[in-house]
């Protein structure tokens, strides 16, 4: 089995950026997704160019910060996106507004001189039933994988599973290994969502999930994790492993 440790929220704060890079340089993270248009974007760009082996996708925003477009449908008439607490009850997303915003974020990412690895979203917003088909369309257009859907633009030949079990109270090295071993016989590629970071003041102000990220960072950079993965024949990879995969289970 191969495992993708994808670090979310690149670009959110410098503490997040530095934690992701640390987990890449000294740990098992080979993949991250960037929130464009956030306060630490420029710092993320600099770190991305300094770490060319770190694969980077777009962490689409529909619940954090301000949109890049001006569709009031995405903000309920405010200056910022709808709140996470409002997302799942909102049933009037306009397809064109969602498409234009997601495309604007992807286009902005590409304008930075970065190569698009894959797509996912903040707060799993892309799994909203009115948003998912639009993001799948964009994944097809850019011929990149989408979290939870795998490859949308061609048939896949091996099984892929996305897990969000490595989060909050479930963060531990032993728990992570037990979870991966429980999946090993059933899937070829597993993506583990993760959020390594240094809990700087901007992160504490922006997110209710801040201090816990430092524990994730400790686990993801532990030499013991690398040893145990190797011992059990689990290879660390990135989303390029999904280029020719087929069967999808997950979000």
UniProtKB/Swiss-Prot annotation:
It is an enzyme of class 3 (hydrolase). CDD domains: YdjC_EF3048_like. Homodimer. One of its GO terms (biological process) is polysaccharide catabolic process. Mg(2+) binds at residues 59, 122. Probably catalyzes the deacetylation of acetylated carbohydrates an important step in the degradation of oligosaccharides. Keywords: Carbohydrate metabolism, Hydrolase, Magnesium, Metal-binding. The keyword Repeat does not apply. It holds the Pfam family YdjC. Its cofactor is Mg(2+). PANTHER family: CARBOHYDRATE DEACETYLASE, YDJC DEACETYLASE FAMILY MEMBER. InterPro entries: COD_ChbG_bac (IPR022948), Glyco_hydro/deAcase_b/a-brl (IPR011330), YdjC-like (IPR006879). Its EC number is 3.5.1.-. GO terms for molecular function: deacetylase activity; hydrolase activity, acting on carbon-nitrogen (but not peptide) bonds, in linear amides; metal ion binding. This is Carbohydrate deacetylase.
